[in-house]
Amino acid sequence: MNPNYLDFEQPIADLEAKIQELRKASTGPAVNVETEVRALRDKLRVRTAQIFRDLSAWQVSQLARHPQRPYTLDYIDTICDEFQELAGDRAYADDKAIVGGLGRIDGRPVVIIGHQKGRDTKTKVARNFGMPRPEGYRKALRLMKLAERFRLPLLTFIDTPGAYPGIGAEERGQSEAIARNLLEMAELKIPVICTVIGEGGSGGALAIGVGDRTLMLEYGTYSVISPEGCASILWKDAAKAKDAAEQLGLTAKRLKGLGLVDKVIREPTGGAHRNPEQMGKRLKAVLLNELDALEKIPVDALLQQRYERLRSYGAYEGH
């Protein structure tokens, strides 16, 4: 199977392969297969729509982890007129699992922070598979305070399986670094927009996920634990990850219904990786619209709304 297709996309892969075969067969001057190709493309569109109309939580999880899915730097390239990356936490090291810096979107200055994964073995190792260490979160905090100092809106892009659980990370205060970011983000005197672009894994995601708006791409996930981890704990069997994904309620649709996500951004048919340019333009339009709304709110009112928003999480009514 083509590695760019997931298992549930096999019918799509088969139709794409047939189209390619016909294209190759049409190289001769006397061969015209356009009618057959058009028919197959129509069938492909219908079949793709059918498959993506009712995805399971596990299938959404697979899409969120797709190796070709756009990452933070890909979106920065698409939405920013210019961007200057800043490095280091000024205390220990520069964690490549988190990127951030100063940018302009349609001339508007912003600070952007996001998780960053790698594409190949070398960059995956360099980025630690998108799992930040304490110095990554402290770098993020440094940039947050920089944004506050210069009164620049903050945009964060969330895409991590979780914070790195290694011994060194724990020794350097992983839990403190995450907790500190939660505290500081709750009190930043600037507009903060957080967007889940892929995986939103537990505290590792939440450490750059406290803000005035939480956006989520259609096939992103946001959860306290991975489906595999949940299955291992509850049923002692990682093979039950599909069941765990359903129970966790980690999809954008479920989280929007619970009020944990403000807006779900529709992805191109087949996922963001099928048309990264289109996805970037959609994301840019939504971010600019949200910034326009937030920048009209006085700082005191913004902080009060953020406080009330955070206090509302977990509230329920008895029956």
UniProtKB/Swiss-Prot annotation:
Metabolic or biological pathway: Lipid metabolism; malonyl-CoA biosynthesis; malonyl-CoA from acetyl-CoA: step 1/1
Catalytic activity field: N(6)-carboxybiotinyl-L-lysyl-[protein] + acetyl-CoA = N(6)-biotinyl-L-lysyl-[protein] + malonyl-CoA
ATP-binding listed as a keyword: yes
Family annotation (SUPFAM superfamilies): ClpP/crotonase (SSF52096)
A Pfam family it matches: ACCA
Enzyme class of the recorded protein, top EC level: transferase
Entry's Gene Ontology molecular function annotations: acetyl-CoA carboxylase activity; ATP binding; carboxyl- or carbamoyltransferase activity
Gene name per UniProt: accA
Keyword field contains ATP-binding: yes
Function comment: Component of the acetyl coenzyme A carboxylase (ACC) complex. First, biotin carboxylase catalyzes the carboxylation of biotin on its carrier protein (BCCP) and then the CO(2) group is transferred by the carboxyltransferase to acetyl-CoA to form malonyl-CoA.
Annotated InterPro entries: Acetyl_CoA_COase_a_su, ClpP/crotonase-like_dom_sf, COA_CT_C
Keywords: ATP-binding, Cytoplasm, Fatty acid biosynthesis, Fatty acid metabolism, Lipid biosynthesis, Lipid metabolism, Nucleotide-binding, Transferase
Enzyme Commission numbers on file: 2.1.3.15
Compartments reported by the entry: Cytoplasm
PROSITE patterns xref list: COA_CT_CTER (PS50989)
Matching NCBIfam families: accA, AccA_sub, PRK05724.1
GO cellular component: acetyl-CoA carboxylase complex
Organism superkingdom: Bacteria
Subunit structure, as described in the record: Acetyl-CoA carboxylase is a heterohexamer composed of biotin carboxyl carrier protein (AccB), biotin carboxylase (AccC) and two subunits each of ACCase subunit alpha (AccA) and ACCase subunit beta (AccD).
Gene Ontology annotations of biological process type: fatty acid biosynthetic process; malonyl-CoA biosynthetic process
Family in the record: Belongs to the AccA family.
Name used for this protein in its record: Acetyl-coenzyme A carboxylase carboxyl transferase subunit alpha
Span of domain CoA carboxyltransferase C-terminal: 32-293
